[in-house]
Design a protein with these regions (language model features):
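Symmetry-related core transmembrane helices of the 12-TM Major Facilitator Superfamily/SLC fold
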Residues: 162-181, 365-384
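Transmembrane alpha-helix termini and helix-breaking/packing motifs in multi-pass membrane transporters
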Residues: 28, 32, 144-165, 230-234, ...
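Glycine-rich segments within core transmembrane alpha-helices of 12-TM secondary carriers
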Residues: 129-150, 339-351
Length: 396
């Protein structure tokens, strides 16, 4: 991989380290203050909506300046989010919607910049290696950060949350400085979203299959992003246990990403994604019998093994389809925007369903059933991604 690719790995590693330190506990923080699942739902719904809007805005701006600025603006928005949470203290749940919007803007800008730069610094020959290596680094950061966060919060509770959010600010600042080493690449060809939008709806295109797969993946991600961690706190009453849970999951995920990056080659992507999606869905089933720390650990370990099997081939295939499209280099930002819009539509639908569920009844059994239902969408995502007919299919 090139030096720019390794630099992107370092920046995303710092970003994931900061989010693993704080985002792991943000939903637990809101839960502890108000103990309402609906508050968490509105916070995450606002976050998903803002992410989609941020991607479109970032795509428009990137064609008038450099895509590195999207990365930086995303990290600066994270800094603003945590500063605001620190200022609001125990009043944070009352501002769940604006806080969710601010965090969503940060995530949208960062991941837009990351995905466009990923396309620029990789190619079909090294994309699987990059995604595997990046997954290893992210998992390594995910091992240490939640453990530190859980330990700090476990010692001092709400004061510990302040320490955790403050540390994240420092890490985001370091990542922002490091982004100055990324090579600029401005685009002056304008923002051509309409042709990519049409391709997304045209059922005979490979891109349509990618879009459906992304929407289905978003259905799973929307509720999993916050509910599992909160269930650990509900089941144990301990942020320290949540930190242990996240660390154990990341440790297993580290090994899984290593294996996937080494052995899952283009001609094995379809099978790997399908196996990963089935295993991820099966990992949720013990929760239907009982929501306890033990069954949540089964879910965490199972997902840590399965998700790299799913996400590495799916991500690589999506970018290969973009790379094979007409005007791929010119329109890469538009393809990234549409990909993330599909993901966020899935997330919004998932969280909206969660809000309807908790408005009707709040029971752990129903929440576990909803996790199982949304997780099964990964199987559909794997099957649809297989229909995208990537370039390696012709070589088999």
């Amino acid at each position: 991989m090139s030096r720019q690719a390794w630099l992107l790995v370092a920046i995303s590693g710092l970003y994931v380290g900061a989010t693993a330190l704080s985002n792991t506990f943000v939903n637990a923080y809101l839960w502890k203050l108000e103990r309402k699942f609906a508050t968490l739902g509105w916070f995450n719904l606002a976050q998903s909506v803002a992410m989609g809007l941020a991607f479109v805005t970032a795509g428009y701006l990137t064609n008038r300046c450099d895509r590195v600025w999207a990365l930086r603006l995303g990290m600066l928005a994270h800094v603003a989010f945590y500063l605001t949470v620190l200022q609001l203290e125990r009043h944070a749940p009352a501002y769940a919607l604006p806080l969710g919007l601010l965090l969503g803007v940060g995530m949208g800008f960062f991941w837009f910049g990351y995905n466009v730069i990923l396309f620029d610094v990789t190619d079909p020959e090294n994309r699987d290696r990059f995604n595997g290596t990046n997954g290893l680094v992210m998992s390594a950061m995910g091992i240490v950060a939640p453990l530190v966060g859980g330990w700090l919060i476990g010692r001092e509770t709400f004061a510990g949350y302040h320490w955790v959010f403050g540390l994240s600010l420092c890490i985001f600042a370091l990542a922002t400085v490091l982004s100055g080493l990324l090579r600029p690449r401005a685009d002056a060809d304008g923002f051509h979203l309409r042709p990519v939008w049409r391709a997304s709806w045209s059922q005979h295109t490979r891109w349509h299959a990618v879009m459906v797969a992304m929407l289905l993946e978003g259905l799973r991600e929307g509720v999993f992003a916050f509910l599992v961690g909160v269930l650990v706190v509900v089941a144990t009453g301990s942020e320290w246990r949540l930190g242990l849970y996240a660390t154990l999951s990341s440790l297993v995920s580290l090994a899984s990403y290593g294996v996937v990056g080494r052995f899952v080659k283009p001609h094995r992507r379809r099978q790997a994604a399908l196996v990963g999606s089935l295993l991820a869905t099966a990992s949720v089933l013990p929760l239907l019998a009982e929501v306890s720390f033990a069954t949540l650990v089964v879910l965490g370990v199972g997902t840590a093994i399965a998700y790299p099997l799913f996400i590495v081939p799916v991500t690589s295939t999506a970018f290969d389809v973009i790379g094979a499209a007409p005007h791929a280099v010119r329109d890469r930002t538009e393809y990234v925007v549409m990909r993330e819009l599909a993901l966020n539509v899935g997330r919004v639908l998932s969280v909206a369903g969660f809000l309807l569920l908790v408005a009707w009844r709040e029971t752990l059994t129903l929440l576990a059933a909803y996790l199982a239902l949304t997780s099964s969408a990964l199987v559909g995502a794997a099957l649809w991604m297989g229909r995208s007919e990537p370039e390696w299919k012709a070589k088999e």
